């Protein structure tokens, strides 16, 4: 039907006859000559129609934006002075000789070059939104990313193997999407939150190296980087420890950036322990492009006459930390109030500060309402530890360590962006030595920080003694510019170790048998040492395209309320369907 893409026609095609198909991006009538910018996936080209061909010209006069056309014509050089250097096709145009309207179009709900379009409207008319050049480029890059990753893994001996979509609910942290079974009334499948157990079973089945680009489902509250259904690059390999896995994944990501973005990433990637990341950045996914760090002050605040600081300093679960902002003394009182309100979202009760006006003037050169509570020795220690200089501002966080880390960690990122401190480029990082467990305060029990199949950094089950909060796992996360793009671990591969971890998590023998019996059985029959990783493909493409949300790199995403404006899903089903599934829906009343 066509000989070329619109965006691929160039000077090498001069004087050639081409057949093009696409949408009308714009139509202009200049002095009896009609110009149509014809657009397809690869770009647009200018087509010229003159009155020498009356029938063709008359058809061109009737054409409007977003009409679908087929054009046949000759490629020629644009007249001198009319070239468009911003277009790959800007040196040429096509003199139209035949024109067929393949379909007309109503006026679209928004212009494709309109920037401020309500997201609900964009998703409602996604088929129009997808025609935007920006969306086309993002999805094309997504395809290139997938192709490059597949090629690398295939070249390194990995097999693309599918795992079930209809499976059994397992406790993985988020709520499952469940699917009723018609043939087993009262029973339900669950859509997979990840292929975790199946990929481990593939290793037990001798598949050695597995990968899959797979859809995963989690029924959780949504944020800018979350969707109810999302795509993972899932990887598992046998007979390889964490050093081997991380090294291979570094090579894969380096190859990806070289091929798709033509950006060199230097290996090996930087590594940092979880404890160091939390101490220095208040986050287990620090953005290393921001040159701001937290400074530990807990050890010197226990005896100050200021309960806001001394209380957390004496609390084993508390923390007092500082965040020095170079030249932050220029921030106004309103700015500080705004940042105080910002950290309040993370549970912080306030945001104490010291402005450093003149270090040579001693206390007189400092400005802060909290100085009166601090002896000279503590003030000197704060200034020394933070490396304060004239013109700086020092913020403080004092509370439970979790709140301090979340509040100052988020403030660090916000200040970095607000003050233009974010360096250009890419800063990949491995975060390692994660805690094996964390304490769930609401449930009053220990839970797995990653998942209960992560191997601990001990050789024998009997070594799993002492405080669970101090046990270290063989887990690793890949972080890129402050976003976790991949997470994995070496897995437990013996029955005794798996049962010991279940016991620490309060999962009794009966519950373990009910939920994971198939895994426990498989471990008995010669399970190899194995490990793996999963990359969030949507997040990775979001970063590589410079997008603000993963919704911008997915063809048909849901809203932040897990609703699809295009299809109006989720929707009610008929009583007949419910009856066939042995389901009765209890309608919610106004009181809930």
From Swiss-Prot:
Q: Name one GO biological process term.
A: aspartyl-tRNA aminoacylation
Q: Which UniProt keywords apply?
A: Aminoacyl-tRNA synthetase, ATP-binding, Cytoplasm, Ligase, Nucleotide-binding, Protein biosynthesis
Q: What Pfam families does UniProt report for this protein, alphabetically?
A: GAD (PF02938), tRNA-synt_2 (PF00152), tRNA_anti-codon (PF01336)
Q: Where is this region: Aspartate?
A: 196-199
Identify the EC number(s): 6.1.1.23
Q: What is its main location?
A: cytoplasm
Q: Which residues bind ATP?
A: 218-220, 227, 484, 536-539
Catalysed reactions, semicolon-separated: tRNA(Asx) + L-aspartate + ATP = L-aspartyl-tRNA(Asx) + AMP + diphosphate
User: Where, subcellularly, is it found?
Assistant: Cytoplasm
Amino acids binding L-aspartate: 172, 218, 450, 491
InterPro entries for this protein: Aa-tRNA-synt_II, aa-tRNA-synth_II, aa-tRNA-synth_II/BPL/LPL, Asp-tRNA-ligase_1, Asp-tRNA-ligase_1_N, Asp/Asn-tRNA-synth_IIb, AspRS_core, GAD-like_sf
Q: What class of enzyme is it?
A: ligase
GO CC, sorted alphabetically, is:
cytoplasm
Which residues bear the site annotation Important for tRNA non-discrimination? 30, 81
GO MF, one annotated term = aspartate-tRNA(Asn) ligase activity
How is the subunit organization of this protein annotated in UniProt?
A: Homodimer.
Name the family: Belongs to the class-II aminoacyl-tRNA synthetase family. Type 1 subfamily.
What is this protein for, i.e. what is its function?
Answer: Aspartyl-tRNA synthetase with relaxed tRNA specificity since it is able to aspartylate not only its cognate tRNA(Asp) but also tRNA(Asn). Reaction proceeds in two steps: L-aspartate is first activated by ATP to form Asp-AMP and then transferred to the acceptor end of tRNA(Asp/Asn).
Q: Could you tell me what this protein is called? A: Aspartate--tRNA(Asp/Asn) ligase
Q: Which organism does this record belong to?
A: Thioalkalivibrio sulfidiphilus (strain HL-EbGR7)
């Amino acid at each position: 039907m066509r000989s070329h893409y619109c965006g691929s026609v160039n000077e090498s095609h001069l004087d050639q006859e081409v057949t093009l198909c696409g949408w009308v991006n714009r139509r202009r009538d200049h002095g009896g000559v009609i110009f149509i910018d014809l657009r397809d996936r690869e770009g647009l080209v200018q087509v010229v129609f003159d009155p020498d061909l009356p029938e063709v010209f008359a058809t061109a006069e009737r054409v409007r934006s977003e009409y679908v056309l087929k054009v046949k014509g000759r490629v020629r050089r644009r007249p001198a002075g009319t070239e468009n250097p911003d277009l790959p096709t800007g040196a040429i145009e096509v003199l139209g000789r035949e024109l067929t309207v393949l379909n007309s179009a109503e006026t679209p709900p928004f212009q494709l070059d309109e920037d401020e379009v309500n997201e609900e409207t964009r998703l409602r008319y996604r088929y129009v939104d997808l025609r935007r050049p920006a969306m086309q480029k993002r999805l094309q890059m997504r395809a290139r990313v997938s192709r490059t990753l597949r090629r690398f893994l295939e070249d390194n001996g990995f097999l693309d193997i599918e795992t079930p979509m209809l499976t059994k609910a397992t406790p993985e942290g988020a709520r499952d999407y469940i699917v009723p079974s018609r043939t087993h009334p009262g029973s339900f499948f669950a859509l997979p939150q990840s292929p975790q157990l199946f990929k481990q079973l593939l290793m037990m089945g001798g598949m050695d190296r597995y990968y899959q680009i797979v859809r995963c489902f989690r029924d959780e509250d949504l944020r800018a980087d979350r969707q109810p259904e999302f795509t993972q690059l899932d990887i598992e390999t046998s007979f390889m420890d964490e050093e081997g896995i991380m090294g291979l994944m570094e090579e894969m990501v380096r190859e990806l950036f070289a091929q798709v973005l033509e950006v060199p990433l230097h290996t090996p990637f930087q590594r940092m322990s979880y404890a160091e990341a939390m101490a220095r950045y208040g986050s287990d996914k620090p953005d290393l492009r921001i040159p701001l760090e937290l400074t530990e002050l807990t050890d010197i605040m226990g005896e100050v006459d200021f309960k806001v600081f001394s209380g957390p300093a004496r609390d084993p679960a508390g923390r007092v930390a500082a965040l020095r902002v170079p030249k932050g003394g220029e921030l106004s009182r309103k700015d500080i109030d705004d940042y105080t309100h910002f950290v309040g979202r993370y549970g912080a009760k306030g945001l104490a500060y010291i402005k450093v006006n003149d270090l040579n003037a001693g206390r007189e050169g400092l400005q802060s309402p909290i100085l009166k509570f601090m002896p000279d020795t503590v003030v000197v220690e704060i200034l020394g530890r933070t490396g304060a200089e004239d013109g700086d501002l020092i913020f403080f966080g004092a509370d439970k360590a979790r709140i301090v880390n979340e509040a100052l960690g988020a403030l660090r990122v916000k200040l970095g962006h607000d003050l233009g401190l974010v360096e250009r480029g890419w800063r990949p990082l491995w975060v390692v030595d994660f805690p094996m467990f964390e304490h769930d305060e609401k449930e009053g029990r220990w839970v797995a920080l990653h998942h209960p199949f992560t191997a601990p950094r001990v050789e024998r089950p009997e070594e799993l003694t002492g405080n669970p909060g101090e046990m270290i796992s063989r887990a690793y996360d890949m972080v890129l510019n402050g976003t976790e793009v991949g997470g994995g671990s070496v897995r437990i591969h013996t029955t005794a170790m798996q049962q010991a971890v279940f016991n620490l998590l309060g999962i009794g023998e009966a519950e373990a048998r009910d939920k994971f019996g198939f895994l426990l059985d498989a471990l008995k029959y010669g399970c190899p040492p194995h490990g793996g990783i999963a990359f969030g493909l949507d997040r990775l493409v979001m970063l590589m395209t410079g997008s603000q949300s993963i919704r911008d790199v997915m063809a048909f995403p849901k809203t932040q309320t897990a609703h699809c404006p295009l299809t109006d899903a989720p929707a009610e089903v008929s009583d007949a369907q419910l009856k066939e599934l042995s389901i009765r829906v209890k309608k919610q009343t106004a009181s809930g």
